[in-house]
Amino acid sequence: MATVNPLSFDRIFAKAPVMAILRGMPLEKSVELATRAWDLGIECVEVPVQSREAVEVLAAVVAAGAERGRPVGAGTVTTAERLAWAVSAGAAFTVAPGLDAEVARASLDAGLPHLPGVATATDVQAARALGLDWLKAFPASVLGPDWFRAMRGPFPEVPFVATGGIDASNAAAYLAAGAQVVAVGSALEDPEQLPALADLLKH
């Protein structure tokens, strides 16, 4: 039986249509950028765990988020081992670039909402069959805004997170096309993009 988790993506993404991804950064830099994201009004932060070293970074950002009541998730959770890392670091949810049924089920059983990557209608149907409500459209910059418009036809009830190649210059276009949330990374390091990101959070 799956563990009951008070968090769901409906709650995680309720306050802001933007998620921050902190990939491959040193611990102190990750905490700094997570804090910048929270100060902007971005509620949700993801730290990918592609190595054991990244687990320490995730744990530090989780601790910083706990002080503010902000959820921090583990990204690139593609194996059972990485799921174990996410659990040990205190992640609130897991994210993956693709859809792996075993990883998805294991994450849900561990009490962590799972956000799998999808790129086709077949992917969407498979993910929904596993009971996954929110889906990550990846890579969004390759799929393009028209992908979201097209998917609204057969899947009007599915909320998508546009991920991959999103920054302040194109985020609004993806939201207008039907993405419920956009995920940004390096944009947080660019002072010129911060005002535009802040504007997204006002709508």
Placement of each model-derived feature along the sequence:
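Structural detector of well-ordered beta-strand residues that form the stable sheet scaffold
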Residues: M19, P71-G73, T94-V95, L115, ...
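Conserved N-terminal beta1-alpha1 strand-loop-helix module at the mouth
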Residues: M1-A92, D109-A110, E157, D167-S169, ...
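Short secondary-structure boundary segments
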Residues: V49, T76, P97-L99, V118-T120, ...
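Short secondary-structure capping/turn micro-motifs that flank functional sites
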Residues: R52-A54, E81, E102-V103, T122-V124, ...
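N-terminal/domain-start segments enriched in small and hydrophobic, helix-friendly residues
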Residues: D39-G41, T120-L135
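Glycine-rich phosphate-binding active-site loops on the catalytic face of alpha/beta enzymes
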Residues: F93-A106, K136-W147, A177-L197
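Catalytic cores of alpha/beta
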Residues: T79-A89, T122-L130, W147, G153, ...
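Conserved functional loop/turn residues at catalytic and ligand-binding sites
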Residues: G41, G90, G98, G111, ...
